[in-house]
Structure formats: structure tokens, C-alpha cells
Amino acid sequence: MGKKSVLWIAAGVILLGAAAWGPIVSNVEQPKYETVETADNIEIRDYAPMIVAETDVSGERRTAIGEGFRTIAGYIFGNNLSSLKVPMTAAVTQQASEKIAMTAPVTQQGDGETWHVRFVMPANYTTDTLPKPNNPAVKIKEIAAKRFAVIRFSGWAGDESLKRRTEELDAFIKSKNLKPLSAPTYAYYNPPWTLPFFRRNEIMIEIAR
């Protein structure tokens, strides 16, 4: 309960402008979930099991997000050991690198000093079929099915905004007599250059079923 987490939604951030971002995000694979309840800008969601690529990063939250993103993006874009076909070629080799489709979300959990940054892997992969990371800092993990209370908002997701929205979500959880099981997870769906009113941000707290 003492740990904080950040969820960074990553979806094709290379060479994309803010104007083009909306349609692209809608076509990016995201973890499967069912909406159990909706109350204005808050939802209760049941998420299916998922596989993530994770790396640990020390430091301030924003700095750690950037470093962790770059580390796992390297794995996504080919810094891995694969026995599968390399896209755009016909070769099959143990030393070939494989590009993995970008998905949403990427998660980051931490205690304020160390953050565990996670990319969600495409659903068509298993832990056996995913290429192995070349970088030992990247780990592949399975995440069990979970239920979350989620609040959605636009604008800049600065510390004060995150604090205020977290308090709003906490109040909702208490009003429903729900049992929180985790600290907040911050979800970002847009690249840094996206205009505030185009941004989609979420805060997620795991709750008991």
C-alpha cells in the first residue's frame, strides 16, 4: 500500500504529431477489461491477465519514467533475442531481433526512489513465445487478473493534478465501501507534445472484488 505506481500508455510515439494521435490510439491494442460500473469520470474495471516487460529505474518520477520508457522501448524495437522471423525478412535465426507491436499500457510502480516500469505485451504472445531481452535490466512477467477503480481526466498530469484526482478517486472508493489493494497507478495515453485538451490521463487503484 505504501508504493506508488505510474502507468504510461505508449502507442507509436515515434514521428507522431498531436493532431494524428487520437485516431492512432484508438487502433492500438490495449489490455482487455470489462467495465463493471460507471459513475461520471470514474469506472470500475475487471482486467484480464497480461504479460509485461519490466525494468527498475531509480530517481525522481518524471526522470524515471523517461529512462524506463527508453530501456523497454529498446526491447520493443528489436534489442532482443528471438527464434522467430524478423519482420520484413525471411530469415529465422537464434540471434535475430524482433520488433514487437506497441500497445497500451506501460506501467511503473515504485516507492518514491525505485520505479518498476512496465510495457504491456501484445495478447498474441506468451512468456514462451516472446523474444528474450538482450538487456538484463528488462524482465518478462505475468500479471494476474485484477479489478481497478479508475478515474479519467484531461490536461497536464502534474503532481498537483495527480494528487487532486487521486483524492477524488479515494473518496469514491470510500463512498462505495471498497477495499483498496494498491497505491495509485498513473496512466498516460499521449506523447509529451500533445496539447492539454487532447490528453487522456487515468489514475488506477486496485480494489478487492
Language-model segments: residues:
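A solvent-exposed interaction/effector surface
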Residues: G2-R209
